[in-house]
C-alpha cells in the first residue's frame, strides 16, 4: 500500500511540475546562437565578478574567445564597465547600533555587436544582512558569502539580459528594413 501511495505522489508531482512549465535550471537556452561565441572584457579581468560572469557564460555553453584572436572585431563583446557595492542601514537596535544592512550590487555592462551599436545592460542585486554584534567572526564570513551570492546572481541576470539585447538587435534590423522599403525611389538625373 505504501509503495502505491509513494508512486502516486511521485507521479503526481512529476505531472504537476511538467504541466506548469517548470524547467530545471540550465535546461532552457538563455543565450542566442549569435552570441554563443563572444569576447569578455572587464575593468577587473581577474576579479570575483568577472570570474562569476565567465563561469555563468560557460554554464550556458558560450565559448569565450580572447581579444587577440578576434582582431577583425567579428564577434560580439560583453564589456563589464564597472560595478559598485553599497551598504545602507535598514534597521537599528534600541541602543542606536545598526541591526540590519541592505546591501546593493550594481553592475553596468555593454554588449557590442559587430557592425552595430552597443547595448547597455544595468543589473542591480539587493540583499539584507543582519548585523549581530556578538558574532563578529561569523558576521564577516556571512558577509563574504552574501557578496559572492550577489555576484553570482548579477552574473545570471547579465546572461539573461543577453536575450533582450538579441531582441533589440532584431527589432533594429526589422525597423531598418522597413525604413528602406518606405524610402521613395531616387530620381535619376537626365544624361546630357
From Swiss-Prot:
Superkingdom of the source species: Bacteria
Localization per Swiss-Prot or TrEMBL: Cell outer membrane
InterPro entries, alphabetized: LPS_assembly_LptE
Coiled coil: none
GO MF terms, alphabetically ordered: lipopolysaccharide binding
Membrane protein topology class: Lipid-anchor
Signal peptide residue numbers: 1-19
Keyword Metal-binding (UniProt): no
Keywords, comma-separated and alphabetical: Cell outer membrane, Lipoprotein, Membrane, Palmitate, Signal
Lipid-modified sites (N-palmitoyl cysteine): 20
Alphabetized Pfam families for the sequence: LptE
One GO term of the biological process aspect: lipopolysaccharide transport
Covalent lipid sites (S-diacylglycerol cysteine): 20
GO cellular component terms, A-Z: cell outer membrane; transporter complex
Chain's role: Together with LptD, is involved in the assembly of lipopolysaccharide (LPS) at the surface of the outer membrane. Required for the proper assembly of LptD. Binds LPS and may serve as the LPS recognition site at the outer membrane.
Record family assignment: Belongs to the LptE lipoprotein family.
Complexes and interactors: Component of the lipopolysaccharide transport and assembly complex. Interacts with LptD.
Name this protein carries in UniProt: LPS-assembly lipoprotein LptE
Organism of provenance: Sodalis glossinidius (strain morsitans)
Gene expressing this chain: lptE
Amino acid at each position: 500500500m505504501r509503495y502505491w501511495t509513494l508512486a502516486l505522489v511521485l507521479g503526481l508531482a512529476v505531472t504537476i511540475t511538467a504541466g506548469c512549465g517548470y524547467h530545471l535550471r540550465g535546461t532552457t537556452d538563455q543565450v542566442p546562437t549569435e552570441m554563443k561565441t563572444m569576447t569578455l572584457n572587464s575593468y577587473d579581468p581577474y576579479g570575483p565578478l568577472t570570474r562569476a560572469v565567465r563561469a555563468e557564460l560557460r554554464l550556458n555553453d558560450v565559448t569565450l574567445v580572447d581579444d587577440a584572436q578576434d582582431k577583425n572585431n567579428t564577434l560580439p563583446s560583453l564589456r563589464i564597465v564597472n560595478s559598485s557595492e553599497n551598504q545602507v542601514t535598514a534597521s537599528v537596535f534600541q541602543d542606536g547600533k545598526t541591526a540590519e544592512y541592505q546591501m546593493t550590487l550594481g553592475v553596468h555592462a555593454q554588449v557590442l555587436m559587430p557592425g552595430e551599436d552597443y547595448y547597455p545592460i544595468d543589473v542591480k542585486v539587493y540583499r539584507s544582512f543582519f548585523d549581530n554584534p556578538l558574532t563578529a567572526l561569523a558576521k564577516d564570513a556571512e558577509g563574504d558569502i552574501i557578496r559572492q551570492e550577489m555576484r553570482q546572481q548579477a552574473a545570471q541576470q547579465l546572461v539573461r539580459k543577453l536575450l533582450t539585447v538579441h531582441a533589440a538587435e532584431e527589432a533594429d534590423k526589422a525597423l531598418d528594413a522597413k525604413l528602406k522599403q518606405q524610402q521613395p525611389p531616387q530620381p535619376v538625373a537626365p544624361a546630357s
